[in-house]
Amino acid sequence: MAETEKIEVRDVTRIERIGAHSHIRGLGLDDVLEARLVSQGMVGQKDARRAAGVVVQMVREGKIAGRCILLAGEPSTGKTAIAVGMAQALGTETPFTSMSGSEIYSLEMSKTEALSQALRKSIGVRIKEETEIIEGEVVEIQIERPASGTGQKVGKVTLKTTEMETNYDLGNKIIECFMKEKIQAGDVITIDKASGKVNKLGRSFTRARDYDATGAQTRFVQCPEGELQKRKEVVHTVTLHEIDVINSRTHGFLALFSGDTGEIKQEVRDQINNKVLEWREEGKAEINPGVLFIDEVHMLDIECFSFLNRALESDMAPVVVMATNRGITRIRGTNYRSPHGIPIDLLDRMIIIRTVPYSEKEVKEILKIRCEEEDCIMHPDALTILTRIATDTSLRYAIQLITTANLVCRRRKATEVNTEDVKKVYSLFLDENRSSKILKEYQDDYMFSEITEEVERDPAAGGGAKRRVEGGGGDAQPMEH
């Protein structure tokens, strides 16, 4: 008797990973820029969201560039969330570059070069180009291959619209494109005459009954109308940084894919700026200033702030949004203290948006949205306990407990997370306050812990000087009497 084969079916892991802000779809504003309480994944912070909505409107108009906005507030008040909401509201057409303040420190590249590249990544250029295309439905296609298998292929294709039908002779390059796209009779295609690119739009509705079953990717379209040969305006959107890389002699086009751009000369950038301004005067191109978001801006030093002072006054500058959670602190690279760790002359160029701590009701709404995002069904009582944990500790800690509580729930073959699951993970994973309390209680058992009490040195060891161990290094230093 033949053995029956067992087929094991496994779920393919999703490519879309759930991130800290993947639930945000926009700023949650209505047509008159009034913030809704809960909308598009955003909760609370009505004033900050409305101010961010005004900035988004300013960026969309594209008339004002070089403005600087600072998002200032305590930790876990949604500064990065507002920046992500701005990126979602602007859409894919507007360049949005996100970076951290510590990303600019590298051995391969200077700090000013890293900032220059980030600024130029945030400025888009829409280049308009008129191309001649052939658009029609394939009636018949004939390709003659040499008997030897090598040599030039020749062929003919018959294309039609609702008004006319024409035969075209095909060259070797176009035939390769046809074979690659798997073009057959009944397909609606476009051929770019300048580049020879073949694009398959779909199947004609007249051929809908050719097959009893078709795949989900099969798309049915109408047969094109009018002339076969048409002129079409194509808009290419590129960033200034991409143009810089392509025109850089040392790296060239391949650096776009490898990412190894290195230093780009200022002369190259100046020439590109002049050319882009020429195209704008001739109507061939439009400059689209985007947004550069710098998180943890207090990590920049005085040289970077000095560079930004000058860069923001340029015509080719994007809108720069910065975020920080520091109060009055030292400016990196100096001994001077200032608000948010930013020099006063740069603060004078900024408009500041303040974020306030979330209320308990708003925290509960955020946790509910995160549960939906992470496919976690949570009992209302468990959600109440998690909200209490978030208000007592931090919102980030409570969000991290959602997935762990869901795993504990699945381990006991249940579908809904209850209060016992939340209590279990709360006891397993410590928050900052409980961890600090344990460290203070058992600090003598840890290595290199700070000993504040002074210990009398043994006279037999030589000398009667008092010594103490400093935290971090463990070096004993003599104390002066």
UniProtKB/Swiss-Prot annotation:
Keywords: ATP-binding, Chromatin regulator, DNA damage, DNA repair, Helicase, Hydrolase, Nucleotide-binding, Nucleus, Repressor, Transcription, Transcription regulation
Localization of this protein: Nucleus
Major subcellular site: nucleus
Entry-linked SUPFAM superfamilies: P-loop containing nucleoside triphosphate hydrolases
Record-linked InterPro entries: AAA+_ATPase, P-loop_NTPase, RuvB-like, RuvB-like_C, RuvBL1/2_DNA/RNA_bd_dom, TIP49_P-loop
GO MF entry, a single one: DNA helicase activity
Annotated positions binding ATP: G73, E74, P75, S76, T77, G78, K79, T80
Tissues expressing the protein: Higher expression occurs in primordia of mesoderm, anterior and posterior midgut and cephalic furrow early in gastrulation, as well as in endoderm and mesoderm lineages during germ band extension. Later in development expression is only maintained in endoderm cells. Expressed in thoracic and abdominal segment neural precursors of all embryonic chordotonal organs.
GO CC terms, sorted: histone acetyltransferase complex; Ino80 complex; NuA4 histone acetyltransferase complex; nucleus; R2TP complex; Swr1 complex
A GO BP entry: imaginal disc-derived leg morphogenesis
Any Pfam family: TIP49
Substrates-to-products reaction catalysed: ATP + H2O = ADP + phosphate + H(+)
Mutant phenotype after disruption: Death at first larval instar.
Annotated spans, Disordered: 453-481
Database matches in SMART domains: AAA (SM00382)
EC number: 3.6.4.12
Function: Acts as a transcriptional coactivator in Wg signaling caused by altered arm signaling. Pont and rept interfere antagonistically with nuclear arm signaling function, and are required to enhance or reduce arm activity, respectively. Also an essential cofactor for the normal function of Myc; required for cellular proliferation and growth. Proposed core component of the chromatin remodeling Ino80 complex which is involved in transcriptional regulation, DNA replication and probably DNA repair.
Assigned protein family: Belongs to the RuvB family.
Subunit relationships: Forms homohexameric rings. May form a dodecamer with rept made of two stacked hexameric rings. Component of the chromatin remodeling Ino80 complex. Interacts with Myc and pont.
Full protein name: RuvB-like helicase 2
Organism of this sequence: Drosophila melanogaster
